[in-house]
Regions:
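PEST-like low-complexity, intrinsically disordered acidic/proline/serine-rich tracts
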Residues: 2, 6-236
Length: 236
């Protein structure tokens, strides 16, 4: 029990290809510094939203993370249209509020325990939502009627989300990426997941979770080159 209320963790804007980097040529008399040689601009929309045979958006593609304060593979600037987490200037959302006992547990963690909360250290699957929040690498999505497969370019992580309307299990077997059910709300695919392995962490700062964790993801593809993923963590 680490949370008092539902808190949206991130509204992450993800692009389908690396940000366009425009290189300015240097003349013989140019005195520009190295960093001034590059102008980073948002990727253009790229065309209309591709769709499956049933008319729903097709999320298939190789997606680079580009939001929530994180650039593509940590090397490129963040798209200025992306919203950083808990930026009071851009969003009225408050940072997560922990119960006193949860906050005390996090503060009592040793340096070793905090390091082990990082999936890059413990080498276990990142889990959800950490696979989005702790992953600076690409995600390849294969979308077909009835199935959404996500292949992550880190530690051989993968995830299968059935989109055939099957309900959540009443007594779910805990998995690193949980047990999911889906529904469409217009052109947005809503994925609700429960039954997570408690060895995963929401963030690599000791933010642990209980077996009551529920994660809701909302996938929207407004154009060819962009995928918006909104994640809400609910931990009573």
């Amino acid at each position: 029990m680490t949370r008092r209320h539902v808190q949206r963790v991130v509204a992450a804007l993800i692009v389908a290809a690396a940000l366009a980097v425009w290189v300015q040529g240097l003349g013989a008399q140019s005195a520009q510094s190295a960093k001034d040689q590059y102008t980073i601009k948002p990727l253009p929309p790229g065309g209309p939203t591709p769709r499956l045979a049933d008319g729903h958006p097709d999320f298939t593609g190789q997606w680079f993370p580009n939001g929530a304060g994180q650039g593509v593979s940590g090397r490129f600037g963040v798209d200025p249209t992306a919203i950083p987490q808990f930026d009071r200037k851009l969003s009225p959302e408050e940072p997560p509020q922990f119960r006193p006992e949860a906050l005390a547990k996090i503060k009592s963690m040793t340096a070793t325990e905090l390091e082990l909360s990082k999936s890059s250290v413990n080498c276990m699957p990142r889990g959800v939502p950490a696979i989005w929040l702790q992953n600076p690498y690409t995600t390849f999505i294969v979308h077909k009627p009835g199935l959404l497969a996500q292949l992550y370019e880190v530690l051989n992580n993968w995830r299968l989300i059935h989109t055939d309307g099957r309900p959540l299990p009443k007594s779910p077997e805990p998995f690193f990426h949980g047990n999911s059910t889906t529904r469409w709300e217009g052109d947005t695919l809503v994925v609700e997941s429960i039954g997570f392995d408690e060895r995963t962490y929401i963030m690599p700062n000791g933010w642990y979770h209980s077996d009551d964790l529920k994660v809701t993801e909302r996938y929207t593809r407004p154009s060819m080159n962009y995928l918006i993923v909104e994640i809400t963590v609910d931990e009573p």
